[in-house]
Amino acid sequence: MESTQQMVSSIINTSFEAAVVAATSTLELMGIQYDYNEVFTRVKSKFDYVMDDSGVKNNLLGKAITIDQALNGKFGSAIRNRNWMTDSKTVAKLDEDVNKLRMTLSSKGIDQKMRVLNACFSVKRIPGKSSSIIKCTRLMKDKIERGEVEVDDSYVDEKMEIDTIDWKSRYDQLEKRFESLKQRVNEKYNTWVQKAKKVNENMYSLQNVISQQQNQIADLQQYCNKLEADLQGKFSSLVSSVEWYLRSMELPDDVKNDIEQQLNSIDLINPINAIDDIESLIRNLIQDYDRTFLMLKGLLKQCNYEYAYE
């Protein structure tokens, strides 16, 4: 029969489940998001390590096995355990282990005062209330009976004096810091406002300049359009006048046609092109006049005539 061993195993497993529940509930109360599987794995690893490394699990299971053997009529193990527990070497070993535990607690910052207070008192929470009940343990009762408890009023007064805080002084300091910060913020804000006003003024001035320049450009564009229209009209009237004058001349028809073609080729829409065309026409006329003059000059020489300009 292994009922005791099964009970011990159940208690150990229940302790592990309680540790997992305590860890997850603490994380939930603190508002920390967690992965249940990760918490379960970490707690199990730490729990198994502590139970195995400290020997607590093997100790509990060993005692459970001894109890089961005694229940089954095998008292040899129980007798050995009884003899071992009453042996002076065992007692010395237990004292040594206790001393090691005390030194370990001291190295972790848990001094004698804290250990004694934890051993003498326990705190009981009252459901639904913020207050608690302080309970004295049997050790505290024994100390009172032995006269080992005293009331130190000086310690209480000294502690109260140390914990006293001059809230008015702190409030004044915070108020001064707040006023100083408020002044700096106001100065920076006023500086930013001035800079923003200056930027707006510069922007409005630039907009006015741009508007004036746009008006001037519009006026110049209108003037250029009028000038271009006037030039187009002048060139058109010039071509018409030259054509009319050409028809009144006693020139051969082929010469008239050639000159008319050159006049009709003048671009009356673009004044720049029109000027180039007129220049080309004038050059051609001068060239024709020059050829005619050379022909006349040669003819006079062949006839033994001389010519002179008057």
Curated annotation (Swiss-Prot):
- Has keyword RNA-binding? yes
Q: Which residues form a coiled coil?
A: 163-234
Question: Where is the segment annotated Dimerization?
Answer: 147-203
Q: Is RNA-binding set as a keyword in this record? A: yes
Kindly list the places in or outside the cell where this protein is found, as annotated in its UniProt entry: Host cytoplasm
InterPro entries xrefs: NSP3_N_rotavirus (IPR042519), NSP3_sf (IPR036082), Rotavirus_NSP3 (IPR002873)
Q: Per its record, what are the GO molecular function terms?
A: RNA binding
Q: Per UniProt, which keywords does this protein have? A: Coiled coil, Host cytoplasm, Host-virus interaction, RNA-binding, Translation regulation
Q: Which residue stretches belong to region Interaction with host ZC3H7B? A: 167-231
Biological process, per Gene Ontology? regulation of translation
Give the source's domain of life in one word: Viruses
Family to which this protein belongs: Belongs to the rotavirus NSP3 family.
Subunit comment for this entry? Homodimer. Interacts (via the coiled-coil region) with host ZC3H7B (via LD motif). Interacts with host EIF4G1.
Stated role: Plays an important role in stimulating the translation of viral mRNAs. These mRNAs are capped but not polyadenylated, instead terminating in a conserved sequence 'GACC' at the 3' that is recognized by NSP3, which competes with host PABPC1 for EIF4G1 binding. The interaction between NSP3 and host EIF4G1 stabilizes the EIF4E-EIF4G1 interaction, thereby facilitating the initiation of capped mRNA translation.
Kindly provide the name given to this protein in its UniProt entry. Answer: Non-structural protein 3
What is the taxonomic lineage of the source species? Viruses, Riboviria, Orthornavirae, Duplornaviricota, Resentoviricetes
